[in-house]
Amino acid sequence: VNLINDFKGLNLISFELTKPQLNVIQTLTQSRIFLHGPAGVGKTTAAVHRMQYLINRGVPAESILVLVPQRSLARGFAESIRVPDFKPGGEPSILTIGGLAQRMIALFWPLAARNSGFLDPRRPPQFLTLETAQYYLAGLVSPLIQNGYFENITVDQNRLYSQILDNLNKSAVVGFPPEEISARLIQAWAGKPTQSIIYDQAQECALLFRTFCLENNLLDFSLQLSLFREHLWPSLLCRKYLQKNYQNLIYDNVEEDYPVAHDIIKEWLPEFRSSLIIFDTDAGFRSFLGADPVSARTIEQSCDLRVEFQDSFVKTPGLQNLE
């Protein structure tokens, strides 16, 4: 089916879409769809055109929230709103949950900082990148290493700093306090019990860094996400703001996101006028970054329509027959 023939007036390039894709694109604007299927069957393509379809049906572009697990996965959506004939007016917000958290913290900082342990909540926050977080962490941990910390392991110091931050990030995306880092690592360790001291030291360094951040209004990824989940998301003021500004959701590659993100969306989903959740049945490879396909699949229960795409655009018939 040719897009131009079926969607006259839409600002989209000519593209051959299948009937299942068109059905998803043209579904009523007030619907909750869970779209799943293997890679290469056109799920993201349908989602991008669904976004454009909503805009051209009169849905305000700024009321659309597009969520992806990593910014690199948002390329198709970002490119579609950069074309010269994109409908003038507002633009959809294309974010990760982490990006949304940072935006809300910046907007509601007095509310977020209150009762959150910051030494001076009147000062504005400073958001850290991975590089700046490692820089501050190195200043705290280097003296400890010189005093004998981590002496039983051989690892590049930058790699060690990265691992300590990763431990904090894992605690935030899964939803457990950083004070449990050591116990969880020891529980998963199958080697010599004497090595457990390394995990105690790693937790001590992580907590030292967290204290330093709270004293200086520095927010790394883990603190941003925890602050949003524990203090802003439960706030009626923040929830009302989000519900007022975003009435339509497109959430792509949900299987690559982490449990805390899924929990937030499951709570938020009933408030959206329309939502399209996209699940790749062949993915979920970023488990080392916190991806949880099992958690992602639970969102399906909150959707009205379940749609499966099966026909691949990238596999040859011969390869499909082998499978």
Where are each of the predicted segments found?
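Accessory N-terminal region flanking or inserted into the helicase ATPase core
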Residues: 3-26, 30-35, 46, 146-250, ...
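Hydrophobic residues on the short alpha-helix immediately C-terminal to a glycine-rich phosphate/catalytic loop
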Residues: 28, 50-54, 77, 268
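The conserved Walker
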Residues: 37-39
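Conserved glycine(s) of the Walker
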Residues: 42-43
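Post-Walker A helix-loop "phosphate-sensing" segment adjacent to the P-loop in P-loop NTPases
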Residues: 53-62
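Conserved P-loop NTPase-based nucleic-acid remodeling module centered on helicase motor cores
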Residues: 61-172
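Catalytic acidic motif of RecA-like/P-loop NTPases
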Residues: 254-258, 283
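Conserved RecA-like helicase ATPase core segment
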Residues: 263-323
